[in-house]
Amino acid sequence: APAITLAALAALDESAGEDPLLLVLSADHFIKDEAAFIEVVNSAMPLALKGYMVTFGVVPNKPETGYGYIKKSTPVDGVNYAYHIDTFVEKPNYDKAKEYVDSGDFVWNSGMFLFKASSFIDELTKYQPAILNACKLSMVGACHDLDFIRIRVEDFSLCSELSIDYAVMEHTKKSIVVPLNVGWSDVGSWSSLWEISKKDSCGNVIHGDIISYNSKNNFIFTDA
């Protein structure tokens, strides 16, 4: 949440009186179908401009215990592609994850968001004012270095290390979820890296000078 707060403050400061949208993405996630992802983001923009805090939920294709889940509620403003959020759920065990997937009511929490900068600041003011105040102080006297903004580290270090989910999204009445199915992965494990990598006829992902015999569905990597 603190890093997003800095981005929101900087965006508002540099927007010449406008209220920009922030698309919050993780630097290390994988999206196979970028065109489809852009289409989903564009469909969510009118809702974000209305003040909704959009989180993108990945349509699950298997019971996954490594992700948090979001339970969908009723449709938003009569559209068929966005839903109010019933609840956020921590990483479940396999049986519970299978129950979620089979129900069709749950999506994976991707950790990707879209909202107006002012909407985020307003909600942060309600639920985590200490984070907002520390970030504001860290921006006082900040210097620009090429494309970077160098903040005051001593003030920023006062921020609590809360994720945006815990700080805002699980509390705000403005949170909604827009499902997406774009070949997403957070590449958070060796198995997920295997899933998104090119495989040979035996299902092996091989990189480097490798000799394999009667092996299937492996991830084998060497610099040799």
Model-identified regions with their sequence ranges:
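Fold-independent oxyanion-binding glycine-rich loops
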Residues: 25-27, 34, 57-60, 73, ...
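Left-handed beta-helix
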Residues: 115-224
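A short, charged helix-loop
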Residues: 73-107
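A residue-level structural signature of the nucleotidyltransferase/glycosyltransferase Rossmann-like core
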Residues: 22, 86, 105, 112-113, ...
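An anion/pyrophosphate-binding glycine-rich loop and adjacent beta-alpha core
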Residues: 103-106, 110, 126-129
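Alpha-helical scaffold segments in soluble metabolic enzymes
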Residues: 3-6, 10, 43-46, 69, ...
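Conserved beta-loop-beta/alpha segment of the NTase-like Rossmann-fold superfamily
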Residues: 1-76, 122-127
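Short glycine- and hydrophobic/aromatic-rich loop-to-beta-strand nucleating segment
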Residues: 68, 111-115
